[in-house]
């Protein structure tokens, strides 16, 4: 894709079936394991690689997405200027992409996602065949989000909600509320104490995570727990971000000298509009900074911080 300088930005609609690919082989082995051991108590973790680059999947999954039907993202003209460290230093590398490159990239990403979806389905089919749904907990999750052209970026490693938010789907037998969706903000740190509790065990003390049991029982439960994300940037160090309810606040650098961001992630999930310098949101900004300070005690606030325009 592009001028070829981005070695990982490659795609291939491969000949052959699912098991010609590593994730297809993994799914087949996991199916064999389940069918052999299903009568015993089991814990099975299956980590698929896709939709990670390089974007290779069997051709049948690419055929689901005709190139001329792929819609490209258009950043709004009135968006706020980006904070200097909002994107990695390699931001300019995608300037060589033309519209055809962008369509092929997005198509390949979706094809790889559909490919993995089919592999997950093979595992769930075993639960059907062996009648395991009544005593098996199932968790489907990812490890990060992804940009598909938003802010001109085609990768991960951001703290925008589209970069930090992950899929998380759970099935717990015997629980009311299964099949419901929730906008409750949780962390992957919460998964361990949740599974320990569902297994009837006592979780260790001093865990940072919190059991999601109340959310599983009542998806609309009042849950005011912040979720934290960090990402490393050269020169400024760490970016610290907190999501609480509908809002995300980010501070670049320990003293905030790299910039501040405040986004309404429900109305603006891509993070196009920065409200950090808006006096109407100063109380919200300071409250969220206070949560960051509790979680990361070494951070502070510089007397003068970089505005969204990059000027001091």
What are these regions (language model features)?
Residues 174-177, 268-272:
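A short, flexible beta-alpha/helix-coil linker loop
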Residues 144-150, 156, 189-192, 197-265, ...:
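C-terminal cap/loop subdomain of S1 sulfatases and analogous C-terminal strand-loop tails that border
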Residues 28, 273, 286:
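Alpha-helical elements of the RecA-like P-loop NTPase motor core of helicases
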Residues 12-14, 235, 271-274:
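Short, local alpha-helical segments
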Residues 1-28, 32-185, 198-201, 205-206, ...:
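Active-site-proximal cap/lid insertion segments
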């Amino acid at each position: 894709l592009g001028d070829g300088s981005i070695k990982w930005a490659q795609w291939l609609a491969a000949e052959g079936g699912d098991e010609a690919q590593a994730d297809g082989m993994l799914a087949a082995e996991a199916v064999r394991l389940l069918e052999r051991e299903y009568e015993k108590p089991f814990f099975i973790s299956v980590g698929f690689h896709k939709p990670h680059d390089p974007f290779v999947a069997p051709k049948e999954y690419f055929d689901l997405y005709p190139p001329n039907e792929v819609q490209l993202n258009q950043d709004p003209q009135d968006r706020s200027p980006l904070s200097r460290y909002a994107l990695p230093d390699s931001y300019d590398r995608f300037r060589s992409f033309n519209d055809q490159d962008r369509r092929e990239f997005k198509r390949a990403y979706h094809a790889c996602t559909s490919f993995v979806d089919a592999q997950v389905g093979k595992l769930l089919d075993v639960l059907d065949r062996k009648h395991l749904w009544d005593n098996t907990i199932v968790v489907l999750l990812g490890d990060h989000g992804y940009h598909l052209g938003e802010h001109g970026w085609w990768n991960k490693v951001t703290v925008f909600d589209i970069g930090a938010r992950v899929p998380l789907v759970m099935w717990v037998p015997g629980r009311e509320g299964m099949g419901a969706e929730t906008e409750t903000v949780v962390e992957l740190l919460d998964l361990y104490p949740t599974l320990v509790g569902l297994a009837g065990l006592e979780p260790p003390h001093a865990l940072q995570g919190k059991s999601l049991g109340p959310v599983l029982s009542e998806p609309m439960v009042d849950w005011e727990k912040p979720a934290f994300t960090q990402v490393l940037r050269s020169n400024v160090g760490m970016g610290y971000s907190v999501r609480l309810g509908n809002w995300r606040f980010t501070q670049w650098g320990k003293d905030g000298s790299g910039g501040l961001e405040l986004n309404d992630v429900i109305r603006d999930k891509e993070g196009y509009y920065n409200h950090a310098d808006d006096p109407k949101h100063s109380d919200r900004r300071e409250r969220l900074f206070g949560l960051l300070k509790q979680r990361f005690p070494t951070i502070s606030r510089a007397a003068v911080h970089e505005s969204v325009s990059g000027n001091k």
